[in-house]
């Protein structure tokens, strides 16, 4: 098979590749946005001075940062369905679908990492700025809202950007639960054509 024939095959499957790309981008985009929403209270709790406030978020973050995303994906997709109470619940129409299982898993996974990014950013806020806020008569809540969080967001933004890129790369594992994301589409096409160029083309 010549290179022209190989590229012709790729062009033939471009619509499917585009659809898979959209699924991947949608999945990653929703995961990092929803994950950020959940990460804010987790990060604030992790930055607390009280151990009993830090304990539960620490356990959550420890689990999701300490185990592979693929294992978490299998636990949600294959593990939860083993419980009859789940299969009879109103959540079952969603939990039996690979898309929602992938979205839930990726959201929980990335929220743990973003929470640690936020915790580090909060602790990196110069103490002088916090002291200045208190000297102006701001309460702890006001200082958090107007001084600490805005400053922490600016500090943590580069690391958050890196997390988005890492999640985009990690999303390749969702094809293992029959998701037709970009990797799932490529695997399907590859099983028909045996062309390895598709992997390089998408990369």
Residue ranges and their predicted role:
Residues 1-203:
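Transmembrane alpha-helices and adjacent helix-loop boundaries
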């Amino acid at each position: 098979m010549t290179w022209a024939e190989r590229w012709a095959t790729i062009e033939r499957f471009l619509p499917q590749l585009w659809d898979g790309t959209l699924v991947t981008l949608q999945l990653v985009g929703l995961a990092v946005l929803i994950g950020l929403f959940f990460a804010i209270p987790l990060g604030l709790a992790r930055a607390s001075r009280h151990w009993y406030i830090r304990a539960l978020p620490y356990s959550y973050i420890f689990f999701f940062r300490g185990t592979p995303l693929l294992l978490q994906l299998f636990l949600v997709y294959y593990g939860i369905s083993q419980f009859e109470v789940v299969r009879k619940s109103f959540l079952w129409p969603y939990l039996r679908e690979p898309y929602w299982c992938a979205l839930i898993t990726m959201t929980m996974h990335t929220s743990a990492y973003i929470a640690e990014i936020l915790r580090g950013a909060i602790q990196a806020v110069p103490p002088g700025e916090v002291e200045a806020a208190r000297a102006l008569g701001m309460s702890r809540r006001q200082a958090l809202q107007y001084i600490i969080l805005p400053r922490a967001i600016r500090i943590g933004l580069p690391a958050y950007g890196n997390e988005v890129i890492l999640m985009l790369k990690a999303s390749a594992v969702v094809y293992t639960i029959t998701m037709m994301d970009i990797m799932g589409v490529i695997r399907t096409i590859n099983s028909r054509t045996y062309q390895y160029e598709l992997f390089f083309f998408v990369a």
